[in-house]
Curated annotation (Swiss-Prot):
It holds the Pfam family zf-met. GO terms for cellular component: chromatin; nucleoplasm. Its main location: nucleus. Residues 140-206, 280-344, 457-503 are annotated as: Disordered. Residues 32-96 form the BTB domain. A zinc finger (C2H2-type) spans 373-395, 401-423, 429-452. The lineage of its organism: Eukaryota, Metazoa, Chordata, Craniata, Vertebrata. Keywords: DNA-binding, Metal-binding, Nucleus, Repeat, Transcription, Transcription regulation, Zinc, Zinc-finger. This is Zinc finger and BTB domain-containing protein 37. GO terms for biological process: negative regulation of transcription by RNA polymerase II; regulation of cytokine production; regulation of immune system process. It is found in: Nucleus. GO terms for molecular function: DNA-binding transcription factor activity, RNA polymerase II-specific; DNA-binding transcription repressor activity, RNA polymerase II-specific; RNA polymerase II cis-regulatory region sequence-specific DNA binding; sequence-specific double-stranded DNA binding; zinc ion binding. InterPro entries: BTB/POZ_dom, SKP1/BTB/POZ_sf, Znf_C2H2_sf, Znf_C2H2_type, ZnFinger_BTB_dom_contain. It comes from Homo sapiens.
């Protein structure tokens, strides 16, 4: 063997064994260099493991000098204990009832693997929790319906649930008191829909399927009966493996006298139909149509793609649409109707139907719901993860960026940088016309617009300062003062204090 040769030695799973030994040391309380306090409970750990597992700890600006960290955002110490164990072992055992707590804690610690898994779990169980109860009630209703004579049209008293506001249910605590009514049926969309669900003709069904009527407060009852073939409406057809949700007008619940009349005196009501898949996929297909005074249906599709639901259990697109309509009363809520027979026939086809839906989506104010970048508190969706992280810090009151000179705390890194420039006097942006200096590009642009109209700032680096400016032009104009500060010629630019933190 040559003396200059290299021998490569590779031990499988050595890194896993190192983490396992570190976990044993943590359990024994040996060689731990940091203590994390969560709701009065202390957890000893190693800084290197926390920094390698969580971007929050890795980007913490004063982690090197700290021996104790207190986290007030995480309310359940057991949740943090499981997450801490995951940092060492890569395994976690969580309770299904605490899935939201794990998602909140993982979002704060920026542990993306836990966030992804919790999101997948929520998407899978969103409908299974309530659909199991609905299916049990419907099965009982079908059994009792088969034992009764066909003349019975109404539900028995033991199946009726009180719809009075005094009847509070767990579902009512979760949903807002909205004066709209959901009618859940085993129905299919109208004939104009291109839904991929399997449709059976309603003419072969003699008895009407049981109807579970639910209002937005979560109060519900089951109604069953028999409908003759001639009296069945056009929209009463069955969809296999799906439950049809229809938002109805309050006329039949509150009475015609409580129904506000429209400006044109018409009695048309808008019906929003959503088909919920009960097979556990958690997908919802949505379509709109209008019922006129004569009962004729006019197709009004608004979305052909699958709408997703938020972890909190609220229908995000529906609430966002109502909010957008209330904020912009001048916007046309009615979608475009086909202007010719050619356009109408194209809309009925699959390709034309998709193009029609895309045109309608462009006109909508609300943006598509993204379950991975959605705030778990207010269901607001974002396009970038950094924007969601900054938004979550506002909800939680997190101020991870601390000034070392005066101790002031800030939510965003750019706010701390601007504050530090007040201490250091660093003004890296210079006006080539009058020689004045400014701490931010936005203030320099404002100076040019106000004092040197027609001139533009010179491109290129303005200072040798290592500090970088991360604020956008719009943010700096809102958050930085507009006063102009002068610097004497030849004044040295002071070095800036380094700040690090989560993006």
């Amino acid at each position: 063997m040559e003396k200059g040769g290299n021998i490569q030695l590779e031990i499988p799973d050595f890194s896993n064994s190192v983490l396992s030994h570190l976990n044993q040391l943590r359990m024994q309380g040996r060689l731990c260099d940091i203590v994390v306090n969560v709701q009065g409970q202390a957890f000893r750990a190693h800084k290197v493991v926390l920094a390698a597992s969580s971007p929050y700890f890795r980007d913490h600006m004063s982690l090197n000098e700290m021996s104790t960290v207190s986290i007030s955002v995480i309310k359940n110490p057991t949740v943090f204990e499981q997450l801490l164990s995951f940092c060492y072992t890569g395994r976690i055992c969580l309770q299904l009832a605490d899935i939201i707590s794990y998602l909140t804690a993982a979002s704060f610690l920026q542990m993306q693997h836990i966030i992804d898994k919790c999101t997948q779990i929520l998407e899978g169980i969103h409908f299974k929790i309530n659909v199991a109860e609905v299916e049990a009630e419907l099965s009982q209703t079908r059994t009792k319906h088969q034992e009764r004579p066909p003349e019975s049209h109404r539900v028995t008293p033991n199946l009726n649930r009180s719809l009075s506001p005094r009847h509070n249910t767990p579902k009512g605590n979760r949903r807002g008191q909205v004066s709209a009514v959901l009618d859940i049926r085993e129905l299919s969309p109208p004939e104009e829909s291109t839904s991929p669900q399997i449709i059976e003709p309603s003419s072969d069904v003699e008895s009407r399927e049981p109807i579970l009527r639910i209002n937005r407060a979560g109060q519900w009852y089951v109604e069953t009966g028999v409908a003759d073939r001639g009296g069945r409406s056009d929209d009463e057809v069955r969809v296999l493996g799906a439950v049809h949700i229809k938002t109805e007008n309050l006329e039949e619940w509150l009475g015609p006298e409580n129904q506000p009349s429209g400006e044109d005196g018409s009695s048309a009501e808008e019906v929003t139909a959503m088909v919920i898949d009960t097979t556990g996929h958690g997908s919802v297909g949505q379509e709109n149509y209008t019922l006129g005074s004569s009962g004729a249906k006019v197709a009004r599709p608004t979305s052909s793609e699958v709408d997703r639901f938020s972890p909190s259990g609220s229908v995000v697109p529906l609430t966002e649409r109502h909010r957008a309509r209330s904020e912009s009363p001048g916007r046309m809520d009615e979608p475009k109707q086909p202007s010719s027979q050619v356009e109408e026939s194209a809309m009925m086809g699959v390709s034309g139907y998709v193009e029609y839906l895309r045109e309608q989506e462009v006109s909508e104010r609300w943006f598509r719901y993204n379950p991975r970048l959605t705030c778990i508190y207010c269901a607001k969706s974002f396009n970038q993860k950094g924007s969601l992280d900054r938004h979550m810090r506002l909800h939680m009151g997190i101020t991870p960026f601390v000034c070392r000179m005066c101790g002031k705390k800030y939510t965003r890194k750019d706010q701390l940088e601007y504050h530090i420039r007040k201490h250091t006097g660093n003004k890296p942006f210079h006006c080539h016309v009058c020689g004045k200096s400014f701490p931010f590009q936005a203030i320099l642009n404002q100076h040019f617009r106000k004092n040197h109209p027609g001139c533009i700032p010179l491109e290129g680096p303005h200072s040798i300062s290592p500090e970088t400016t991360v604020t956008s032009r719009g943010q700096a104009e809102e958050e930085s003062p507009s006063q102009e500060e002068t610097v004497a010629p030849g004044e040295a630019v002071q070095g800036s204090v380094s700040t690090t933190g989560p993006d």
